[in-house]
Structure formats: C-alpha cells, structure tokens
C-alpha cells in the first residue's frame, strides 16, 4: 500500500460520495500510477443505475481515473508535501478517446492504471485504463491542469 484513503483525502478535495479512489498501490513520479476502488452494492448510484441490474456508470469510471491522475500530478509536482497544498486543485480540461468495453458491477475491484503521455508546467496529459480482474473495462486520454483554487 502506498496511499490509503486517509492520505488520498489529504491530497484530493473530493469526499463521499464522490471520492472514487480507495487506495494507491503504485506511483512513479511524473510517470505512472495504479490505484483502485472497490465497487459495492451500497454505492448510492445503484439506486437509480440500474436497480434491477446495477451497472456502475462509465462516467464515474472516467472520474475515478481522473482522480487517480490528480494524485499523480500532485505528488509529481509537490512530492511528500502534496497534502500541504490546499490552495491548489486539479481541473479536468478534456477527455478524448473514451471507450467503455465491459460493464462494471457490484463486487468488482476497479483498478485504474494511468501513464503520463506529456507534462509541461501544470498541464498533464494522461493515458488512463481501467481494469476488473485484469480485463480492460474502459480507457480514455485525459488532460488536466493543476491550478490555484481562487482563480
């Protein structure tokens, strides 16, 4: 375990029910991250998506990848001081090449793997993939920016 949920909460501003990363298991600064979220039937989203046959929304899979990418960007830029930058936030800039291949359902361990494609200053372009049982379930190219919260 690299970062548990308490450490992740020190880095990201997201909170329940929108914190979509439970743990970071691998991180190489300015290169890559692996993290996961355990999907349970208790997720609020399953009350409406879909009650008879619950499917975790693809948009939340992408958001989880983006949050993992936010941890990677913060740790890459600020190192061990990543949790001491409350004045900064990561914003999504774009999502490209998104594909959803297999539905994610309750009981799945959703693993996010992201690699840095390009990084310049506070701008990050990441290749993200999500897996369940080592099977690719979704992928996307994400662009994000670390910015001041007040701007």
UniProtKB/Swiss-Prot annotation:
Locations listed in the record: Cytoplasm
Principal cellular location given in the protein's record: cytoplasm
Reactions accelerated catalytically: a (3R)-hydroxyacyl-[ACP] = a (2E)-enoyl-[ACP] + H2O
Cellular component aspect of the GO annotation: cytoplasm; membrane
Disulfide cross-links: none
Highest taxon listed in the record's lineage: Bacteria
GO MF annotation terms: (3R)-hydroxyacyl-[acyl-carrier-protein] dehydratase activity
GO BP terms, alphabetized: fatty acid biosynthetic process; lipid A biosynthetic process
Keywords: Cytoplasm, Lipid A biosynthesis, Lipid biosynthesis, Lipid metabolism, Lyase
EC number annotated for this UniProt entry: 4.2.1.59
Xref: InterPro entries: FabA_FabZ, FabZ, HotDog_dom_sf
Protein name (Swiss-Prot/TrEMBL): 3-hydroxyacyl-[acyl-carrier-protein] dehydratase FabZ
Species the sequence originates in: Wolinella succinogenes (strain ATCC 29543 / DSM 1740 / CCUG 13145 / JCM 31913 / LMG 7466 / NCTC 11488 / FDC 602W)
Gene: fabZ
């Amino acid at each position: 375990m690299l970062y548990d949920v308490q450490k992740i909460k020190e880095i990201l501003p997201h909170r329940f029910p929108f914190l979509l990363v439970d743990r970071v298991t691998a991180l190489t600064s300015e290169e890559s991250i692996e993290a996961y979220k355990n999907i349970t039937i208790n997720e609020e989203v399953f009350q409406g998506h879909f009650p008879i046959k619950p499917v975790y929304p693809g948009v939340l899979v992408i958001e989880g990848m983006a949050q993992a990418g936010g941890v990677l960007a913060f740790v890459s830029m600020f190192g061990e001081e990543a949790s001491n930058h409350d004045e900064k936030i990561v914003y999504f800039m774009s999502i490209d090449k998104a594909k959803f291949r297999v539905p994610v359902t309750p009981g799945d361990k959703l693993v996010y793997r992201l690699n840095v494609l390009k990084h310049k200053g506070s701008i990050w372009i990441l290749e993200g993939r999500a897996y369940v049982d080592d099977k690719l379930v979704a992928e996307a190219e994400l662009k994000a920016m670390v910015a001041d919260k007040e701007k």
